[in-house]
Amino acid sequence: MVKMLVLYYSAYGYMEQMAKAAAEGAREGGAEVTLKRVPELVPEEVAKASHYKIDQEVPIATPGELADYDAIIIGTATRYGMMASQMKNFLDQTGGLWAKGALINKVGSVMVSTATQHGGAELALISTQWQMQHHGMIIVPLSYAYREQMGNDVVRGGAPYGMTTTADGDGSRQPSAQELDGARFQGRRVAEITAKLHG
């Protein structure tokens, strides 16, 4: 059975919802899934004042454990067109894994959230994939296999590189049913492709 980690950073809970949906999809695809998050770097008093969702019950990951999985889906908030510093800080601690080649031929995939439709989602998806490629990971994107991302009648999440959601910091827009469905699709797709590669 494929062992998968869904690893995320979420300040306001939007990516937490997407990560849980991706984990559901991966389980539907036959994977044994672990859901974890990266540590918060913002001081607690600042996080509270900024209305961060600080009651997330999902356990915190350690960089060394990434080698324990066949596949890793990373979900991160986007800051100025890049992954959030919390996720970057976590991934920057994986140099020891890189030196050992511990993630070579593992499967990787990425999802992101932004506060606006033009908030740099595709840049964040691709730059996060770069980190995975430096580790020798095999990238499985959302791709246009997920057809529900097509059309512009409403705000739709998704890009060929990975699933996206647009959610306002004030909570007025949460991940939509279509965006959560896309996260489930991506999780299932990664599980099924990983099973073919590692099964």
From Swiss-Prot:
Its cofactor is FMN. GO terms for molecular function: flavin adenine dinucleotide binding; FMN binding; NAD binding; NADH:ubiquinone reductase (non-electrogenic) activity; NADP binding; NADPH dehydrogenase (quinone) activity. Keywords: Flavoprotein, FMN, NAD, NADP, Nucleotide-binding, Oxidoreductase. Substrate binds at W98. NAD(+) binds at Y12. One of its GO terms (cellular component) is membrane. Its EC number is 1.6.5.2. Residues 163-177 have a biased composition (Polar residues). Residues 4-190 form the Flavodoxin-like domain. Residues 158-181 are annotated as: Disordered. This is NAD(P)H dehydrogenase (quinone).
